[in-house]
C-alpha cells in the first residue's frame, strides 16, 4: 500500500469517527451488563452544579421527571433514596451529564452522556469490588436554539438504554445483540 493510500485511509477513518451524533453502547456485550438489573438510582448532574435554570428553558428537575417517567413506563424501577440504593444488589446508578455553552450565534452547543455505573468484581481477586461504568451512550455534539430540544435528545439516549435493557433481559437475545441502528 502506498503512503498516500495509508494517509487517505487514516484521514477517512478519523473523519468518520469524529462525526457528531449518538455513539452506541459498545458492541462487545456492554448491553449484557443490564441483565438482571432490578432498578436504578438516578443522578442528574445539574442537581449538584445548578447549571440549568429556568431562564435557559431547562431545569434539572425537568430532566429528572422526564427520565423517571420514561423508565417507569418501560417497567424499569427507579430507586428513590440513597439508603434504598445502598441496599440494592450492585448499587446501580444511571448518570445523566449534559454540558453546554451559549455560542456567539445565540445557540446552545454541547454534549450529552448517559452512563450506568454499578458494582463490579475483579476477576483475578474477587475480594475487590468497585463501582465502574458498565454501559453508556452519548451525543458527542449538539447545537440547538432552545434547550428544551435537549430533552428530546436525552430521550433518544434513554430509549437506547430501555432497548438494551429489554434485550438483555429477553431470553431470546441472551448471547447476541439484535442488529439495530442507534440514531
Model-derived features: positions:
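Intrinsic disorder/low-complexity segments
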Residues: 5, 12-14, 71
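Surface-exposed short loop/turn segments
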Residues: 82-145
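N-terminal secretory signal peptides that target proteins for export/translocation
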Residues: 1-7
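Bacterial N-terminal signal peptides
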Residues: 9-21
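N-terminal, post-signal-peptide region of Sec/Tat-exported proteins
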Residues: 54-86
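C-terminal/domain-edge helix-coil "capping" segments
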Residues: 26-32, 122-183
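A structural "domain/chain start" motif
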Residues: 21-65, 163, 167-183
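Generic secondary-structure microfeatures
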Residues: 38, 44-48, 67, 75, ...
Amino acid at each position: 500500500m502506498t503512503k498516500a493510500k495509508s494517509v487517505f485511509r487514516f484521514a477517512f477513518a478519523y473523519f468518520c469517527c469524529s462525526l457528531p451524533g449518538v455513539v452506541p453502547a459498545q458492541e462487545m456485550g456492554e448491553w449484557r451488563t443490564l441483565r438482571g438489573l432490578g432498578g436504578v438510582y438516578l443522578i442528574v448532574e445539574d442537581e449538584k452544579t445548578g447549571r440549568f435554570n429556568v431562564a435557559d428553558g431547562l431545569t434539572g428537575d425537568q430532566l429528572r421527571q422526564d427520565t423517571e417517567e420514561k423508565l417507569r413506563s418501560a417497567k424499569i424501577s427507579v430507586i428513590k433514596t440513597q439508603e434504598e440504593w445502598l441496599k440494592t444488589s450492585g448499587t446501580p446508578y444511571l448518570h445523566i451529564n449534559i454540558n453546554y455553552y451559549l455560542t456567539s450565534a445565540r445557540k446552545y452547543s454541547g454534549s450529552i452522556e448517559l452512563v450506568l455505573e454499578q458494582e463490579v468484581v475483579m476477576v483475578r481477586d474477587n475480594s475487590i469490588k468497585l463501582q465502574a461504568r458498565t454501559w453508556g451512550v452519548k451525543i458527542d455534539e449538539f447545537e440547538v436554539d432552545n434547550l428544551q430540544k435537549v430533552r428530546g435528545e436525552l430521550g433518544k439516549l434513554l430509549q437506547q438504554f430501555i432497548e438494551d435493557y429489554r434485550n438483555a433481559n429477553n431470553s431470546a437475545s441472551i448471547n447476541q445483540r439484535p442488529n439495530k441502528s442507534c440514531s
